[in-house]
């Protein structure tokens, strides 16, 4: 799917179709390309003068965040949160050529959707009138805010998990901890890579950015550093919670083994006595005594009581 938003030379915001675009007629054009078909990708390539193979780089989810300079365009790869069954990350390709900014991605990125909504419902000139560098900043800022929202929500989830953990071991809690830890691993790696991109953007790497744009990128850089620290801290908390969960499971298992051992020990001597009386000896004590059965039973009860007393004194039960 291809969406085009542009600001005309008279300052009006329009949404022309790709075929209708004439780059000379607009001050700034933003094309967003989401999960394009081969035909759409070929049409886009022909229109903007960037090869299909170059465009496919932006669609590769495994691409590492970076800034590249080609003969007539700049390529920025940036990592954004991906909301599926588990929250992970995906790659966003950003191409800048003259007055064109192209975002291309194979997965749905919520930050892009929010920016579209901002442009359609509020004053779009805030985003477009200050140049292509400011539009780039807004895109990266929305992605950074997505990370921030998720990590802030994660803080509440961690408190909830701690309460459940203190209430007792639960397999669902362990699965939730593993899922969150996986998310934080993806986030931490992606944020570190995004930080490296922002280092380049705030150091005059792109000639299309103004001094104000570079100051904005510097703010984003420090915001990203904060998010990296948050993700590292939360990951350590989750690791500690995993250790506690495993310890609780081991304690529970030890309790079960202790109970089984005590039961086995308590009944070992009575079973030994009954085993002896089950043998075919010609003579056994109390075998011919009318009260023999009850005496033997009483002996076994006494032995059991002695074991129970010993275990209680030892604090095992």
UniProtKB/Swiss-Prot annotation:
SUPFAM superfamilies cross-referenced by the UniProt entry: CorA soluble domain-like, Magnesium transport protein CorA, transmembrane region
Reactions catalysed according to its record: Mg(2+)(in) = Mg(2+)(out)
Keywords recorded for this protein, A-Z: Cell membrane, Ion transport, Magnesium, Membrane, Transmembrane, Transmembrane helix, Transport
GO cellular component: plasma membrane
Cell compartment(s), UniProt: Cell membrane
CDD domains: TmCorA-like
Membrane topology: Multi-pass membrane protein
GO molecular function list: cobalt ion binding; cobalt ion transmembrane transporter activity; identical protein binding; magnesium ion binding; magnesium ion transmembrane transporter activity
Chief location category: membrane
Residues the record marks as site: Important for closing the ion permeation pathway in the closed state: 260
Stretches of the chain found on the membrane's Cytoplasmic side: 1-258, 312-317
Residue intervals on the Extracellular side: 280-290
Transmembrane domains' residue ranges: 259-279, 291-311
Xref: InterPro entries: CorA_cytoplasmic_dom, CorA_TM1_TM2, Mg/Co-transport_prot_CorA, MgTranspt_CorA/ZnTranspt_ZntB
Activation and inhibition: Inhibited by cation hexaammines.
Threonine that confers selectivity for Co(2+) transport (site feature) positions: 261
Site features described as Essential for ion permeation, chain residue numbers: 254
Annotated function: Mediates influx of magnesium ions. Alternates between open and closed states. Activated by low cytoplasmic Mg(2+) levels. Inactive when cytoplasmic Mg(2+) levels are high.
Family stated for the protein in its record: Belongs to the CorA metal ion transporter (MIT) (TC 1.A.35) family.
Subunit structure: Homopentamer. In the absence of Mg(2+), interactions between subunits are weakened, and dimers, trimers and tetramers can be observed in vitro. Was initially proposed to be a homotetramer, based on the cross-linking studies. This is in contradiction with current 3D-structures that clearly show it is a homopentamer.
Comment field on protein domains: The central ion permeation pathway is formed by the first transmembrane domain from each of the five subunits. Mg(2+) binding strengthens interactions between subunits and leads to the formation of a symmetrical homopentamer surrounding a closed ion permeation pathway. Low cytoplasmic Mg(2+) concentrations trigger both a conformation change within each subunit and a loosening of the interactions between subunits. This results in an open ion conduction pathway. In addition, this results in a less symmetrical shape of the whole complex.
Name under which the protein is recorded: Cobalt/magnesium transport protein CorA
Annotated source species: Methanocaldococcus jannaschii (strain ATCC 43067 / DSM 2661 / JAL-1 / JCM 10045 / NBRC 100440) (Methanococcus jannaschii)
Gene this protein is translated from: corA
């Amino acid at each position: 799917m291809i969406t085009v938003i542009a600001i005309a030379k008279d300052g009006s915001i329009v949404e022309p179709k790709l075929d209708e675009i004439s780059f000379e007629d607009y001050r700034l054009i933003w094309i967003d390309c989401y999960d394009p078909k081969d035909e759409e990708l070929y049409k886009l390539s022909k229109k903007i003068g960037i090869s299909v193979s170059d465009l496919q780089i932006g669609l590769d989810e495994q691409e590492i965040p970076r800034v590249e300079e080609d003969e007539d365009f700049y390529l920025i790869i940036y990592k954004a949160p991906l909301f599926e069954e588990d929250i992970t990350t995906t790659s966003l390709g950003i191409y800048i050529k003259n007055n064109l900014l192209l975002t291309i991605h194979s997965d749905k990125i919520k930050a892009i959707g929010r920016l579209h909504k901002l442009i359609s419902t509020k004053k779009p000139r805030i985003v477009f009138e200050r140049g292509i560098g400011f539009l780039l900043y807004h895109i990266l800022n929305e992605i950074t805010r997505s990370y921030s929202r998720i990590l802030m929500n994660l803080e509440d989830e961690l408190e909830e998990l701690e309460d459940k953990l203190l209430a007792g071991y639960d397999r669902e809690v362990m699965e939730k901890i593993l899922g969150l830890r996986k998310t934080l691993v993806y986030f931490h790696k992606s944020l570190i890579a995004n930080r490296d991109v922002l280092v380049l953007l705030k150091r005059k790497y792109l000639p299309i950015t103004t001094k104000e744009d570079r100051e904005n990128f510097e703010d984003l850089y420090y915001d990203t550093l904060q998010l990296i620290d948050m993700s590292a801290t939360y990951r350590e908390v989750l690791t500690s919670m995993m250790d506690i969960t495993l310890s609780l499971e081991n304690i529970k298992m030890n309790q079960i083994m202790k109970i089984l051992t005590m039961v086995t020990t308590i009944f070992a001597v009575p079973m030994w006595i009954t085993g002896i009386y089950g043998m075919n000896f010609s003579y056994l004590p109390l075998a011919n005594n009318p009260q023999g059965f009850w005496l033997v039973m009483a002996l076994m009860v006494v032995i059991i009581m002695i074991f129970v007393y010993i275990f209680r004194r030892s604090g095992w039960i």
